[in-house]
């Protein structure tokens, strides 16, 4: 008997799925396409990603399902860490390997010059977003203007580079490269950083590889590929999800008794005696029916009062 393909089987209803999938996005996939595929494989009703990763980039793409989507904005705001391979000596139209070569210059860069140039980009810097980006101008993504051969004025944006570490160099090769680890704020374009570094070195440069390794406190440890997700059984796929509170591990933990838990879930403010500084966000756990202690949500702690901000309904 021939096994039916998934598309030939009776359509399975969408279901409530709650948690975070740490996806190791493959090259060539857009973030949205990867999200749609994972959502279908999990038969999830609700899902969202936590910031786009270019199709040419690989690496960590946290996908939020169900109640975890309430905290996806926190990851959008979080710092990111990337590993980037920059090819020196060639500048392209897209600042990456996909573009047309605009110029070629000889590379005569010493390790000392490289370190000095990199130091100029650590801290708060102004970046002009690349034309080949999803940033919108008058409601239209910049890459659409670029594909039409148009260049539009873009205002520089202030971003923060926390650290740049040199992982490897091959400065004397026929195709000289430098491999960097970059920890940066949201909105930082690594392609632009690579291009600007090339200009600072006087030789030009473009990005040839990019991999995201960390988003906030989440890392590639335990991340799953789309291939592994597709090959897994339904139960195995569900087990690959991290719990909702995986997004909240940097927040202090507060546990409530049964009565305070009930009041918290009704959105009531709770005067409590807690050894925590004021104005701090906390993750709140407590009794939920017969389920025992579980995540109830996130609250603000100020002036001895716990104020519910985002409730979780699991």
Swiss-Prot record:
It comes from the Bacteria. The keyword tRNA processing applies. Keywords: Isomerase, tRNA processing. One of its GO terms (biological process) is mRNA pseudouridine synthesis. Its EC number is 5.4.99.25. It catalyses: uridine(55) in tRNA = pseudouridine(55) in tRNA. Pfam families: TruB-C_2, TruB_C_2, TruB_N. The keyword tRNA processing applies. GO terms for molecular function: RNA binding; tRNA pseudouridine(55) synthase activity. The active site is at 54 (nucleophile). Belongs to the pseudouridine synthase TruB family. Type 1 subfamily. Responsible for synthesis of pseudouridine from uracil-55 in the psi GC loop of transfer RNAs. This is tRNA pseudouridine synthase B. It comes from Ralstonia nicotianae (strain ATCC BAA-1114 / GMI1000).
